[in-house]
Swiss-Prot record:
Localisation per UniProt entry: Plastid, Chloroplast membrane
Protein's name according to its UniProt entry: Probable plastidic glucose transporter 2
UniProt GO cellular component terms: chloroplast membrane
Organism: Arabidopsis thaliana (Mouse-ear cress)
TM spans (from-to): 52-72, 94-114, 128-148, 151-171, 182-202, 211-231, 293-313, 329-349, 356-376, 392-412, 424-444, 450-470
Compositionally biased spans, kind Polar residues: 1-14
SUPFAM superfamilies: MFS general substrate transporter (SSF103473)
Amino acid sequence: MLGLQRETSSMYKRTSSRDYSPMIDVEDSSGLLENDVDNEMETTNPSWKCSLPHVLVATISSFLFGYHLGVVNEPLESISSDLGFSGDTLAEGLVVSVCLGGAFLGSLFSGGVADGFGRRRAFQICALPMILGAFVSGVSNSLAVMLLGRFLVGTGMGLGPPVAALYVTEVSPAFVRGTYGSFIQIATCLGLMAALFIGIPVHNITGWWRVCFWLSTIPAALLALGMFLCAESPQWLFKQGKIAEAEAEFERLLGGSHVKTAMAELYKLDLDKTDEPDVVSLSELLYGRHSRVVFIGSTLFALQQLSGINAVFYFSSTVFKSAGVPSDLGNIFVGVSNLLGSVIAMVLMDKVGRKLLLLWSFIGMAAAMALQVGATSSYLPHFSALCLSVGGTLVFVLTFALGAGPVPGLLLPEIFPSRIRAKAMAFCMSVHWVINFFVGLLFLRLLEKLGPRLLYSMFSTFCLMAVMFVKRNVIETKGKTLQEIEISLLAKP
């Protein structure tokens, strides 16, 4: 469990996993794998309780991600007034969006940090700029200092999601990996809602926006400290040649009876990859033997953003205001829809599978965008159009949270081979942030030039394209170990 005393790495000799000679003959590892898998299937799955505390600590990074996405929404007017740029829409936009620049930079380095320092240390490195940036934002007395603080926070936001996806995927037993992966999305929703509720007093208490930033240092510090007690990824330890430590961490996460099977799977994969270099280059990701899965991952993230989710979040306040609903109440409705969809996804992820959730999620989002298109019709009464618009917004957020939101972050670490997993996630997340930036930058301009009907039709078309892409390219990973998924992908021509 979480509180067990960690054995120091100095007790173990650091050797290459390929040179290490275990007690069992490595040449027999393939047969051992098959026998052990059969035996284990005849008994029971590993206990989910062993890995749960480690997953919960890791999802603090996702809570922080959601919190910092929403922390300036309510206080922005007070911030601009206190710092002297009230009415300057460009400056206000920079305060909101400068995080994206930091997040893009952080995502570029996330793979190197996760592979170089390990998953646990990567979380701690992620927490540092979040603590420093939140403190700087809270004490800022000018726009420049505020932007510096927000940029620092953004770098932590860019580091956190890829590392969280990697860690949760690598420490979770196969039969609950989908459920645990959904915790990431739920934590993000809770962070967004926490930022909303904490920001409510900002209109009545002078300088409350500073408290909103400072409060975020508490979960960031808990993340950094909690990781001292958490298990390191056994896959990462194995790659580093720390065989005994990998076995010890498997025992903490799965239980002693499942260690031999898990290690045999790693040895089988290691034998299959003896001709591959240790260093993963960008050219290998784009043109190497695993380029197809990298293409699938980056395209999924691109389609996720091109579906219009951030535009819907951005425009939801206007939609609710036009229907006579206060913006803060409208934000609560959106937050509840997001959380409800995420909870349903958590329940269904390991029952119906990732692919089916993705398909129905994008289908539902396309239908919701069709409702938005219908709401722009001049033939509808005003009240009916408002109902369609509000209903379309809530249905879109709900169906997004069912699959298109949580599944890519879970699915990609599952289908990426262990050797390239961190670097491939970093590449795909950088694609995510670039598309995110341009959608946010161009949405209002396109809305003005094209009108809502054509723009929402484009978003609906992207959702339908995503349905076809998922149906053709995405494999089902439900209930399979990471090693089984990798072996099946390697077996494909």
